[in-house]
Amino acid sequence: MQFKLLQRDFSSPLTMPELDFTVQRLSNRQPGGPDQATITATGSERALFELAEWMQCPVMLYDDHNDPAWWGYLDTLEINVGAIRLAVRMDQVFNRVAVVYSYVAPGSASVGTRATTAWVQDDDSVALYGVHELLLSISGATAAQAEAARDAALAMYKLPITTVEVNPGNAQNGATLTCSGWWKSLSWQYFGESGTSSVETSAQIAAIVVAEGAFLTGTLIEDASGISSSEYRQGDQSAQFCILELLASGTSSGRKLLAEINRWRELRIWEMPDRSGDNAEIFIRSDGQLDGISGVDVLAQHAPVGVWGLLKDVIPSSLDTNKIADPGLFWVEQAEYDAVTGVYRPIVAGAWRFGSEIKEG
């Protein structure tokens, strides 16, 4: 598999001739699509440290046919040089902050009504990384106290924080890049809606993406939910949380509503297919080989999820499937592909792990 780190504007790949990259593993989940990927890098110390300049840059992984297999951004970087390990993480970056507090007037012992400070942001950080919001909560505070807490949090978290560890084992020089899918970016901003109309849930999802999906290009609704609910949102939950709530109600036909970020960074919405072998998209043989409808020999490298799978030539025909659910048919909720061993590991609905490792066919 091939790894590419792109410019922040999603244009041409960055050129890093002093570094060699190796894809270790990737995973997908439903809902969301691309979840995590791990890549290791070796090369000069200078080039390893310069990777920190590219935090949150877009990442693409390509299969052995040079087709996109996974997409996301650089989320965490760990650098090992001699006895020193440095880690840089994006999940503690907050460049736009406000504080919710219960007001207590000076000289009073009673807690007043809920109040919220104005939002403040660091424009340089926002220009570099986009908006990462944090809504803190303080009980029994004055307005000045809440604003001081807000300003302190912004100063502390506006840029990625580097942690340092001493590793006496003197590990080999190198870096580990942990990447996250763009679904995670929907957790960076809160979503509020003052309207109180009853709106179809998939249309509400599309509206949330327009409002808060800064790194997404739009929504692709293949199947409308057919269910309506109040559009009102107080504004103290993330956009991702609001979308998950709307997905949870499913469709009017009683099936799950699925979501993934596709390769064009659209949030694709569709209905879970009926439980039927006719709807199976992946097939697992008794020797562990993974096949697809089109017979793509690199299917495992895409770690397919949100699909029905079927065991092929495994379950004996004598088994009475009127007494148990068809054991040969399963729904893949999560999956990981180990790029080193070529093994596909699905996790099926019901939170149990498929008993054998699935090898790349």
For the regions a protein language model found, what residue spans apply to each?
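Amphipathic, non-transmembrane alpha-helical segments in extracytoplasmic/periplasmic proteins
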Residues: 17, 30-39, 99, 172, ...
